[in-house]
Curated annotation (Swiss-Prot):
Ranges where the record places region Disordered: 638-709, 721-757
CDD domains membership: SAM_liprin-alpha1_2_3_4_repeat1, SAM_liprin-alpha1_2_3_4_repeat2, SAM_liprin-alpha1_2_3_4_repeat3
Comp. bias intervals (Low complexity): 729-742
Subunit relationships: Forms homodimers and heterodimers with liprins-alpha and liprins-beta. Interacts with the second PTPase domain of PTPRD, PTPRF and PTPRS. Interacts with RIMS1 and RIMS2. Interacts with GIT1 and GIT2. Interacts with GRIP1. Interacts with KIF1A.
Name of the gene this protein is made from: PPFIA4
Bias (Basic and acidic residues) ranges: 684-695
Organism this protein belongs to: Homo sapiens
Full protein name: Liprin-alpha-4
Record function comment: May regulate the disassembly of focal adhesions. May localize receptor-like tyrosine phosphatases type 2A at specific sites on the plasma membrane, possibly regulating their interaction with the extracellular environment and their association with substrates.
Length: 1185
């Protein structure tokens, strides 16, 4: 701003006339200056006001800038370096994902091309392949090739990939649509950002325009102008900084948008990857659903097969019930026959009395005619009984034919079930077709079974009709008994009228004293010769019947009746009896005779009614589990369990009706065979060693005439005194017979004991059998109804068939003995020898033996069979049964190898010797029989599956697995080859502690070299004292827990798997584990302290585990006593074992330790334990699946 000074006008050169004008001009100048100053002051005031406004606006702009800065700082992250690093990482991941996507697309294109090519090929060659498959199936219907599976799998693969392609296309289309929508949204967002930026530029221009200050053309003071200039510079700086901040804000917003775009792409990639993972998961779920569907189909098919099998078993049970009912009908018929015979005898007695009275009083021809009519009626009744008996035999024949047809259908069902199982394993994709075929077959079988059931119903109706006929016979016999009563009354009347003819009759002895009865023939000379002969024949017949009646009819009422009959015969046959009582008066004699006749009539009536009621109510008695009084006659025919108690199955408690009504089959155990070999003759011993022969075991009916005939056949020379002694023995020991009967009924639920009395009665040593029947300790033998029915009409034919069986069994043993003596390798054995070996040594079931007999012709074929061939040809579907057969084959191949000397095992079970040494042993110590065969020299011959199931498993405390072990026929030979899968799947041993317990039990057997006698001996020695805990059973551990004062907790050890070998060998088993098993509470510190103290004492006294010196007090295994000794020199036997070990297979281990001696000094060289090597410890990995 510049100051404008007023212009000074130069005056006139004239001077004075112009002075007044100059003063006026100065005043005017001063007025103008004052006006100008006022204007300047007003302009200054306005400028100051504008400056204040601009300053206020500047403050507002600064405040707005600060707000924007704070907003920017809050919106943007603090660390730009980490943000950029994460951005670079996201970009790298994005590139990797893009590369993976490109690779997957390439692979997908390649697979699409390959699938299209395969589809073209399959569609081109499908018809020819189907024709070849059809031809191949027509040629070999048993096996089906896998081309059908390949075709169906390829078709399913094509369809699956087409479905996947369609899904991928749909997802790609949806992703593209989403990308277009997102791009449109992004374009809209960009437009909004540009519009906002333009709006910000307009606001900046307005601010800049408003910030300029126009200065008037007036001059200002220097201070004011300087301040204004400084304010303008400051405003320019602030505007510049504001523009810079806005530029930075724009750059930051661009970076933020870029980052948001990168984040969106990363999110899209993540979504795509999640979609891929979800797609894979859905595919996996679909595959699992398909798998579950297939498993459900397989389970439904198995359920249908099981239902068919249950139907077959129900039909078998129905068949057994029908047979049982038929046996009951036979027993009822026999009782009827017996009672008819007794009635006939009583009638003959009455006829004898009548003849005597006729001799004394010849004036009674009418009575004789009436008696003749009664005799004719009785003969007609006997003829009717004969017709009924023939009808029953015909019904029995028809029932046996139906049983054979049922057996054949059962065999067909088993074969078809096995075929179905094979097809299920091979063709899992064709289950529907197999299901329809199996349904058709099952419907056919159902129709056949329904027809068989209808036939059986007709048989039942016929049996019911025969039962009605028998009841009619009973009524007829009742009428006959009433007629006999009438006859007796008439006889009494005749006696009353014929008093003078009975003067010579003396008083008779008491009715029950049969020992004082004597026969006097003094008065028989007066009778006619025919009458005398008839009387003598009748007396001989009654004398013959007296003994069997005494032996068979055990009840006191039958005894009294038989004695009464004998006394009555004596009384009426003789005119005088031994006695000195003198003649009685005639009325008293007549009264006494009348009373005795009435008593005998009452006894006959009670016998008839009680016999019929017992026969009719036999089923009810059996359902109640009670044994009628007439069943006491079963003492000779009852079967107690064997002395060892190992063959009787241990069953849970069931109802008496189930124990009596259910019947099954059971194989003869080796202990029972040994017991019979000791007791019976050599011929019967050879016969009783027949292995796995099964027979239906039924409850024996009451004694019948067949029993009488068998007893006559068994001991014809038995005197009356011996019969009385047998009767006294039976009466004195009823508890033993009842207990044996009860044990028989309990054991007969599933398995029956093979009856052999039919064979025993046909042998020469009958006196020995009679001794057996008397001796209660040796047990009794059960007579089945089938053998009764076979022995009664055709005893010679039965003996002939039994001799044939004996001859066949002896021939089988002879074949095995010849093969052993000749030292023939197993590959050179012929078919009969192999079948005999399977039947007598291995103990395979009869079904497998029959299949081997049909398919295996030599030992070479048997040893060359693979696992699949064993399953397919022989039909052994159980894997453990196949393992049993493979181990037996491997054992025989090794033992009969031509390079090694043939070996056998002595009765001790520990030493393997050659045949020459065995013969020397046999010559030095003769056995009780000439059985040099393999029955007693077998490896593990005394540790068969019955010993494992009945003795060994309960001794380990694992009796709950007995049925599974028995079903899989697990013997000691198989124990070391059981895998975890076998234990879990086949033997249902899921508990790991139970498997551990079983493993330590097997280790105990290894340490004893699988010697059963040694095991039993050591258990017996350690039964009453704390030593040799290794062989303790579960019961001994329970007894020990009870003895230390923990009786309340001892019951928890049952079925727990705790035994001595587990305590002695398991390092991890301590007192805390035992307390946990005993379920001793942790609060009961006293009981736990007692357990700890006694457990440590038990380990110190009875095991090799010792306590460490440390604080933890953990028991450790001390070196075994076997490690402390050197093996002694084996001389010849050690050389033999080493030579035989060279010829055995690679996996076959031989124990080279013989009997060990204690060393002279402790510091000896430590040798390995003997239990790590034993003869049958080899693993047959080649045979395993």
């Amino acid at each position: 701003m510049c100051e404008v000074m007023p212009t000074i006008n130069e005056g006139d050169r004239l001077g004075p006339p112009h002075g007044a004008d100059a003063d006026a001009n100065f005043e005017q100048l001063m007025v103008n200056m004052l006006d100008e100053r006022e204007k300047l002051l007003e302009s200054l005031r306005e400028s100051q006001e504008t400056l204040a406004a601009t300053q206020s606006r500047l403050q507002d702009a600064i405040h707005e800038r600060d707000q924007l800065q704070r907003h920017l700082n809050s919106a943007l992250p603090q660390e730009f370096a980490t943000l950029t690093r994460e951005l670079s990482m996201c970009r790298e991941q994005l590139l990797e994902r893009e590369e993976e996507i490109s690779e997957l697309k390439a692979e997908r294109n390649n697979t699409r091309l390959l699938l299209e090519h395969l589809e073209c090929l399959v569609s081109r060659h499908e018809r020819s392949l189907r024709m070849t498959v059809v031809k191949r199936q027509a040629q070999s219907p048993s096996g089906v090739s896998s081309e059908v599976e390949v075709l169906k799998a390829l078709k399913s693969l094509f369809e699956h990939h087409k479905a996947l392609d369609e899904k991928v296309r749909e997802r790609l289309r949806a992703a593209l649509e989403r990308v277009t929508t997102l791009e449109e949204q992004l374009a809209g967002a960009h437009q909004q950002v540009s519009a906002l930026q333009q709006g910000a530029g307009v606001r900046d221009g307005a601010a800049e325009e408003e910030g300029t200050v126009e200065l008037g053309p007036k001059r200002l003071w220097k201070e004011d102008t300087g301040r204004v200039e400084e304010l303008q510079e400051l405003l320019e700086k602030q505007n510049f900084e504001l523009s810079q901040a806005r530029e930075r804000l724009v750059t930051l917003t661009t970076t933020v948008t870029e980052l948001e775009e990168d984040l969106g792409t990363a999110r899209r990639d993540l979504i795509k990857s999640e979609e891929l993972s979800s797609k894979h998961q859905r595919d996996l779920r679909e595959a699992l659903a398909q798998k579950e569907d297939m498993e459900e189909r397989i389970t439904t098919l198995e359920k249908r097969y099981l239902a068919a099998q249950r139907e077959a078993t129900s039909i078998h049970d129905l068949n057994d019930k029908l047979e049982n009912e038929l046996a009951n009908k036979e027993s009822l018929h026999r009782q009827c026959e017996e009672k008819a015979r007794h009635l006939q005898e009583l009638l003959e007695v009455a006829e004898q009395k009548l003849q005597q009275t006729m001799r004394k009083a010849e004036t009674l021809p009418e009575v004789e005619a009436e008696l003749a009519q009664r005799i004719a009626a009785l003969t007609k009744a006997e003829e009717r009984h004969g017709n009924i008996e023939e009808h029953l035999r015909q019904l029995e024949g028809q029932l046996e034919e139906k049983n054979q047809e049922l057996a054949r259908t059962a065999v067909q069902v088993r074969q078809r079930e096995k075929m179905n199982e094979d097809h299920n394993k091979r063709l899992s994709d064709t289950v529907d077709r197999l299901l329809s075929e199996s349904n058709e077959r099952l419907q056919l079988h159902l129709k056949e079974r329904m027809a068989a059931l209808e036939e059986k119903n007709t048989l039942i109706q016929e049996l019911e009709s025969s039962q009605r006929q028998i009841e009619e016979q009973h009524h007829h016999k009742g009428r006959l008994s009433e007629e006999i009563e009438k006859l007796r009354q008439e006889v009494d009347q005749l006696k009353g009228r014929g008093g003078p003819f009975v003067d010579g009759v003396h008083s008779r002895s008491h009715m029950g004293s049969a020992a004082d009865v004597r026969f006097s023939l003094g008065t028989t000379t007066h009778a006619p010769p025919g009458v005398h002969r008839r009387y003598s024949a009748l007396r001989e017949e009654s004398a013959k019947l007296a003994l069997p009646l005494t032996v068979t009819l055990r009840s006191p009422t039958w005894m009294r009746m038989s004695q009464g009959v004998c006394c009555n015969l004596e009384y009426h046959s003789s005119g005088t009896l031994c006695g000195s009582s003198g003649p009685l008066p005639v009325p008293e004699m007549i009264q006494e005779e009348k009373e005795s006749t009435e008593l005998r009539a009452e006894e006959i009536e009670t016998r008839v009614t009680s016999g019929s009621m017992e026969a009719l109510n036999l089923k009810q008695l059996r359902k109640r589990g009670s044994i009628p009084t007439s069943l006491t006659a079963l003492s000779l025919a009852s079967a107690s369990p064997p002395l060892s108690g190992r063959s009787t199955p241990k069953l849970t408690s069931r109802s008496a009706a189930q124990d009596l009504d259910r019947m099954g089959v059971m194989t003869l155990p080796s202990d029972l065979r040994k017991h019979r070999r000791k007791l019976l003759s050599p011929v019967s011993r050879e016969e009783n060693r027949e292995d796995k022969a099964t027979i239906k075991c039924e409850t024996s009916p009451p004694s019948s005439p067949r029993t009488l005939r068998l007893e006559k056949l068994g001991h014809p020379a038995l005197s009356q005194e011996e019969g009385k002694s047998a009767l006294e023995d039976q009466g004195s020991n009823p508890s033993s017979s009842n207990s044996s009967q009860d044990s028989l009924h309990k054991g007969a639920k599933r398995k029956g004991i093979k009856s052999s009395i039919g064979r025993l009665f046909g042998k020469k040593e009958k006196g020995r059998l009679i001794q057996l029947s008397r001796d209660g300790a040796t047990g009794h033998v059960l007579l089945t109804d089938s053998e009764f029915s076979m022995q009664e009409p055709m005893v010679p034919a039965k003996l002939g068939t039994q001799a044939e069986k004996d001859r066949r069994l002896k021939k089988k043993h002879q074949l095995l003995e010849d093969a052993r003596r000749k030292g023939m390798p197993f590959a050179q054995w012929d078919g009969p020898t192999v079948v005999s070996w399977l039947e007598l040594w291995v103990g395979m079931p009869a079904w497998y033996v029959a299949a081997c007999r049909a398919n295996v012709k030599s030992g070479a074929i048997m040893s060359a069979l693979s696992d699949t061939e064993i399953q397919r040809e022989i039909g052994i579907s159980n894997a453990l049964h196949r393992l049993k057969l493979r181990l037996a084959i491997q054992e025989m191949v090794s033992l009969t190898s031509p390079s090694a000397p043939p070996t056998s095992r002595t009765s001790s079970g520990n030493v393997w010797v050659t045949h020459e040494e065995m013969e020397t042993l046999e010559t030095s110590t003769k056995t009780d029989s000439e059985e040099g065969s393999w029955a007693q020299t077998l490896a593990y011959g005394d540790m068969n599956h019955e010993w494992i199931g009945n003795e060994w498993l309960p001794s380990l405390g694992l009796p709950q697995y007995r049925s599974y072990f028995m079903e899989c026929l697990v013997d000691a030979r198989m124990l070391d080859h059981l895998t975890k899968k076998d234990l879990r799947v086949h033997l249902k041993m899921v508990d790991s502690f139970h498997r551990t317990s079983l493993q330590y039990g097997i280790m105990c057997l290894k340490r004893l070299n699988y010697d059963r006698k040694e095991l039993e001996k050591r258990r017996e020695e350690s039964q009453h004292e704390i030593k040799d805990v290794l062989v303790w059973t579960n019961d001994q551990v329970v007894h020990w827990v009870q003895s230390i004062g923990l009786r309340d907790y001892a019951g928890n050890l049952h079925e727990s798997g705790v035994h001595g070998a587990l305590l002695a060998l398991d390092e991890n088993f301590d007192h805390n584990t035992l307390a946990l098993i005993l379920q001793i509470p942790t609060q009961n510190t006293q009981a736990r302290q007692v357990m700890e103290r006694e457990f440590n004492n038990l380990l110190a006294l009875g095991t090799d585990r010792k306590l460490d010196d440390g604080d933890d007090k953990v028991f450790r295994r001390a070196p075994s006593w076997r490690k402390r000794f050197r093996p002694r020199e084996h001389h010849g036997r050690g050389g033999m074992l080493s030579a035989s070990a060279e010829t055995l297979p690679a996996g076959f281990r031989v124990s080279t330790l013989g009997t060990l001696q204690p060393p002279p000094a402790p510091p000896k060289k430590i040798m390995p334990e003997a239990h790590s090597h034993y003869l049958y410890g080899h693993m047959l990995s080649a045979f395993r699946d």
